Amino acid sequence: MKQPSYSITETDLALLTDLYQLTMLQAYWAEGMQERATFSLYFRRLPATRRFMLACGQQYAAELVTRLGFSDAQLTRLADTGQFRDDFLAWLGQWHFTGDIWTLPEGTPVFENEPFMEVDAPIAEAQLLESLVMNLVQLETVIASKAVRVVLAAGERPVMDFGLRRMHGIDAAVRGVRAYRTAGLAGTSNVLGGLRHGMPLSGTMAHSYILAHDDEEAAFTAFARHYPDTTLLVDTHDTLEGVRKVINLMHAEPGLRVGAVRLDSGDLGQLARGARTLLDAAGHSEVKIVASSGLDEWKIEALV
């Protein structure tokens, strides 16, 4: 049995809607209802911990809508459902968006009951777009709104995205990088997302790399030789002992340059202060400290 494809392309998106949007569209068409209507996208209520949301995805959605259309294959599949008239499907095959879309610029803070995207079109067309537009905008707005809180909590310190493995599917992982860029993150570990959306790539090393070597010193040395000014992960066994090993490595091989050490577990605040003390005392105040491990705005605020 042939497995269905998991990939979704732009040409598939005309069918990315709820069934009732299409059945209402057919009813509007059959009744000759062509009056213009305005559909507004806004937050009626914000969560108790949020003062604003960061609008994102609406300009992408607006551009996409202008390219939407139904292919012959899609019309055939709709006909197979038995819910649509042949003359309606013939009309749908010629359909393209004829309305207007208004949006605030992406990256604009928005508040309760403040529209940040409006579709003004014949009511049938505006109705058809509702589910797709809300899906496109909701994802990126939610991600950007969380990300900007993290950026604000970090202040002058750059924030990187290492969240690919926890994102809810491939589409969210790639489009999430676009939202992170809008929110002001400095880089991402997501290669596809970063290259597609023009965001600098950033990465360090994994605990598995450390464990693949005989000891931490061997892992640090090999990685630093290949990648000057790299970031070394120091918490696989003992965080502060890992920092001492990095210091010893830089002293033993003066040509090796280490840009930062990364802390990924434990009491990050206490360990960061300890690492800073060790590095400064050894004459390596230029080596930065990177903290990771599920950090959100609350944890970052406590750290800085």
What is each model feature region?
Residues 33, 37-93:
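N-terminal, Lys/Arg-enriched amphipathic/low-complexity engagement segments
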